């Protein structure tokens, strides 16, 4: 038996995550791993490749594409799929595309609900997945802090925060009826700093957007938004400036704020994490739609 007392804290976290990944594959018929292309997804993919090496991944990766992701994210996603040879499923809500749902005209709440939440539910119904891996961590946001590692979802993919299953030690309740599912979070006990240290130690590839670089940005409601393509509406009083910025978290580019930074290497990012006093999700505009907005989104089926 593995003596966890002799492991570093990162190796303990790694061992726990690998145990969860293997447990799910043993218990469920049709698991899938969400792949948002961010740093947490990069770590989760790396852990999965380790967990089942030398075999190929026993489940596909799913990316819900809103068509508003950073161009570099899509390029990186396709590159990683080709390098590692995993099965990549990409789904976009066709109704949202038909209605031209976008964050500028319809706002972040409607855009997130239709293109992300409904898009995800469509994909899960289409492929009939009964377990879905996600890269959420408890230190990210208050609604995620109280969520279990095995998070039960009903037939409509809804979460009831008042009716969660107990988790004693490393024992997980995987019982589901037909049509129900479990969202599984192998990185629940990791912190943002843990993620960056692990990426550095393991040499995990990540999207270049995480590193500081001179990028074209405009300021909207006090948030620096990168001008990633010609769809960005620029008002008369707004000026596009080249600034040294990076991203602590990634999503749809019109809803993701950049932070001023000079960190161009992993050690510099880690140093920045040690000194920062702000949340990594401060730049995610979807978190600020209303009070408790993330919990409401999760109850409706969001990850």
Curated annotation (Swiss-Prot):
Its EC number is 2.7.7.4. GO terms for biological process: hydrogen sulfide biosynthetic process; sulfate assimilation. InterPro entries: PAPS_reduct_dom, Rossmann-like_a/b/a_fold, SO4_adenylTrfase_ssu, Sulfate_adenylyltrnsfr_sub2. Coiled coil: none annotated. Pathway: Sulfur metabolism; hydrogen sulfide biosynthesis; sulfite from sulfate: step 1/3. The keyword Nucleotidyltransferase applies. GO terms for molecular function: ATP binding; sulfate adenylyltransferase (ATP) activity. Disulfide bonds: none annotated. Gene3D superfamilies: HUPs (3.40.50.620). HAMAP family: Sulf_adenylyltr_sub2. With CysN forms the ATP sulfurylase (ATPS) that catalyzes the adenylation of sulfate producing adenosine 5'-phosphosulfate (APS) and diphosphate, the first enzymatic step in sulfur assimilation pathway. APS synthesis involves the formation of a high-energy phosphoric-sulfuric acid anhydride bond driven by GTP hydrolysis by CysN coupled to ATP hydrolysis by CysD. NCBIfam families: CysD, PRK05253.1, PRK12563.1. This is Sulfate adenylyltransferase subunit 2. It comes from Sulfurimonas denitrificans (strain ATCC 33889 / DSM 1251). The lineage of its organism: Bacteria, Pseudomonadati, Campylobacterota, Epsilonproteobacteria, Campylobacterales. The gene is cysD.
